[in-house]
Amino acid sequence: MSTLGHQYDNSLVSNAFGFLRLPMNFQPYDSDADWVITGVPFDMATSGRAGGRHGPAAIRQVSTNLAWEHNRFPWNFDMRERLNVVDCGDLVYAFGDAREMSEKLQAHAEKLLAAGKRMLTFGGDHFVTLPLLRAHAKHFGKMALVHFDAHTDTYANGCEFDHGTMFYTAPKEGLIDPNHSVQIGIRTEFDKDNGFTVLDACQVNDRSVDDVIAQVKQIVGDMPVYLTFDIDCLDPAFAPGTGTPVIGGLTSDRAIKLVRGLKDLNIVGMDVVEVAPAYDQSEITALAAATLALEMLYIQAAKKGE
């Protein structure tokens, strides 16, 4: 099957099923798309249960449950009438070669950004965010990070490819500014001296959504923002299908409201990662991820309609 980059893809996990039944475009660089969806079926950097490579396919498949609603509640307009969104399928790389994946994903992102496109990416494990940050920083300069997760992923363990080290590496490479970055939903140990503002799950669950969003806006300011959502930010009651679930997380309702509240930020790139459908129940994790991805597109469409 010829897919992204006109490469022959014999992968057992890549998927050419368009998100929301959106049109597939395997050469999105020359398209008139505003936003391009890319799947990255990669889970070699996981430290927990593997299976995130099947995440993009699961998100796309369950998104058919969302495609029917045109004037989506509570937005009351059709995102597809304001944004031109295409799905370019999955990144093709030699399975087992983490370096090739990283280099190809960064090159793909750089080419899209140079063509004036914006990216919504489906992982895969969370390591895929690092090559995306490298590409976005080349185009937009140093960015703020808004990061939803149960873990800070700022661990300095010396591994080059590890889904728990990206946000230790990214500041050192000058890709993001921790002083203007926020990590939301954290409920595992972390280094309190890394510069990031951490809004742990306890306080995010206890505070009002408006209060949390006001603090995020104050910290981020007018910097370009990269938005990354690890599905294990949600409590396992709402997202069991992930590699490293942690009890005590956000509800899907609260997460959606928080994402909607980010509408006024200068978001330049977005991803949803760490869906591992082998551990899912009734596709609820994939549905949560697909819904959050759709809400991310809606906050972009809402700005375009203003």
From Swiss-Prot:
Top-rank taxon: Bacteria
One GO MF term on file is: manganese ion binding
Q: What class of enzyme is it?
A: hydrolase
Q: Which CDD domains match?
A: Agmatinase_PAH
Q: Could you say which cofactors this protein requires?
A: Mn(2+)
Q: Which residues bind Mn(2+)?
A: 126, 149, 151, 153, 230, 232
Catalytic activity of the protein: agmatine + H2O = urea + putrescine
- GO annotations under biological process? putrescine biosynthetic process from arginine, via agmatine; spermidine biosynthetic process
The protein's UniProt keywords, in alphabetical order, are:
Hydrolase, Manganese, Metal-binding, Polyamine biosynthesis, Putrescine biosynthesis, Spermidine biosynthesis
What are its E.C. numbers? 3.5.3.11
Which pathway?
Amine and polyamine biosynthesis; putrescine biosynthesis via agmatine pathway; putrescine from agmatine: step 1/1
Pfam families (UniProt xref): Arginase (PF00491)
Matching entries from PANTHER family are given as: ARGINASE/AGMATINASE, GUANIDINO ACID HYDROLASE, MITOCHONDRIAL
Family, per entry = Belongs to the arginase family. Agmatinase subfamily.
What exactly does this protein do?
Catalyzes the formation of putrescine from agmatine.
Instruction: Write the protein's name.
Output: Agmatinase
Species for this entry: Shigella sonnei (strain Ss046)
The gene name on file is speB
